[in-house]
């Protein structure tokens, strides 16, 4: 390894990334940098399975649980913060280990990103309020009137992309698609990325997904989301996509029993994990894939990663 090397430990939710990354950081003088879009937020460490205090007491962690849920966050903002932290870590002659499953962040960090102009806070607030008032379908119809191309590429149920495309057009007068076709900008072109993709066998992955959600529900996620619901208006947490939030809110509103909410969250987590695996397989080409089908094989992964990543 050199001071220009970065390890990215990626994979689906509940694949064991956090444990493996923590153990690597302890063994090889590393520091952990978050590359998960939901773990950046304050007040939801349980539902997002953020690193526990026992981990942060042993290893230095960056970009976890620092952002208010009312604040807007974008891939460009993430990249700037991540680049700063990576340079700080390497300046201390330590190994940056990025852990997460947000494909857009990983892809943009490694292969470059589309620099879309920032949206003013006033306009952002206006669009959020409009969405709260009229909902996805009507907002999609408004987007189609302004930007037919973008609307044709966005599912009406994809709230985040829908709002993003609408506000970009209002801010710039241009389709978000016009920015996405420009040459990509590289933020860390002089660094070497070593991407380790954890790919558990599907049956084992689904088992760990179910166990993860069961543990989260039992260890405080319901109280965590109840507090969010009490302290903030729904429009303030529209961008919180962590699996389990929607189901817990339904339980708190009396629309689901607790058992049904847990079951629904487990199903959605398995579906999300499956999509993540497909995305990483298809979108990240230059990577090392590590497969395992049970706990015993997973335990051996820690012995394999150093050689695959070139850690000495």
UniProtKB/Swiss-Prot annotation:
Which UniProt keywords are present, listed alphabetically?
Answer: ATP-binding, Magnesium, Nucleotide-binding, Transferase, tRNA processing
Q: Where is this site: Interaction with substrate tRNA?
A: 102, 124
List every stretch annotated Interaction with substrate tRNA.
36-39, 160-164
Record flagged with keyword Hydrolase: no
Q: Which InterPro entries match?
A: Dimethylallyltransferase, IPT, P-loop_NTPase
Matching entries from Pfam families are given as: IPPT
Q: Which reaction does it catalyse?
A: adenosine(37) in tRNA + dimethylallyl diphosphate = N(6)-dimethylallyladenosine(37) in tRNA + diphosphate
According to the UniProt record, which cysteines are disulfide-bonded? none
Needed co-factor(s)? Mg(2+)
- GO molecular function list: ATP binding; tRNA dimethylallyltransferase activity
Q: Which domain of life is it from?
A: Bacteria
* Gene Ontology biological process terms from the UniProt entry: tRNA modification
Which amino acids does the record list as binding substrate?
Answer: 13-18
The entry sums up its family as follows: Belongs to the IPP transferase family.
Could you tell me what this protein does?
A: Catalyzes the transfer of a dimethylallyl group onto the adenine at position 37 in tRNAs that read codons beginning with uridine, leading to the formation of N6-(dimethylallyl)adenosine (i(6)A).
Q: What is this protein called?
A: tRNA dimethylallyltransferase
Recorded source organism is Rickettsia akari (strain Hartford)
Underlying gene: miaA
């Amino acid at each position: 390894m050199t001071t220009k090397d970065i390890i990215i430990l990626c994979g689906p939710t509940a694949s064991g990334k956090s444990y493996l990354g923590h153990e690597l950081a302890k063994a090889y003088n590393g520091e952990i940098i978050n590359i998960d879009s939901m773990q950046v937020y304050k007040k939801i460490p349980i539902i997002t399975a953020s690193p526990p205090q026992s981990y942060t007491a042993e290893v230095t962690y960056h970009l976890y649980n620092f952002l208010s849920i009312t604040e807007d966050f974008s891939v460009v903002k993430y990249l700037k913060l991540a680049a700063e932290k990576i340079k700080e870590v390497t300046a201390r002659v330590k190994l940056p280990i990025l852990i997460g499953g947000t494909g857009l962040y990983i892809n943009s960090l490694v292969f470059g990103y589309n620099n879309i102009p920032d949206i003013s806070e006033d306009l952002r607030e206006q669009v959020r309020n409009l969405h709260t008032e009229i909902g996805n379908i009507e907002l999609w119809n408004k987007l189609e009137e302004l930007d037919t191309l973008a609307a044709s590429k966005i599912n009406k149920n994809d709230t985040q992309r829908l709002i993003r495309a609408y506000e970009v057009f209002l801010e710039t007068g241009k389709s978000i698609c016009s920015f996405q076709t420009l040459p990509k900008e590289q933020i860390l072109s002089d660094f070497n990325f070593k991407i380790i993709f954890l790919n558990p066998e599907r049956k084992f992955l689904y088992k760990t997904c179910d166990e993860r959600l069961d543990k989260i529900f039992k260890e405080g996620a319901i109280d965590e989301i109840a507090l969010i619901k009490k302290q903030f208006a729904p429009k303030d947490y529209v961008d919180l996509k962590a699996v389990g939030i929607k189901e817990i809110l339904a339980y708190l509103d009396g629309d689901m029993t607790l058992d049904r909410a847990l079951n629904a969250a487990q199903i959605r987590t398995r579906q999300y994990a499956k999509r993540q695996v497909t995305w990483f397989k298809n979108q990240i080409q230059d990577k090392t894939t590590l497969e395992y089908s049970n706990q015993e094989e997973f335990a051996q992964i820690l012995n394999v990663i150093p050689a695959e990543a070139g850690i000495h």
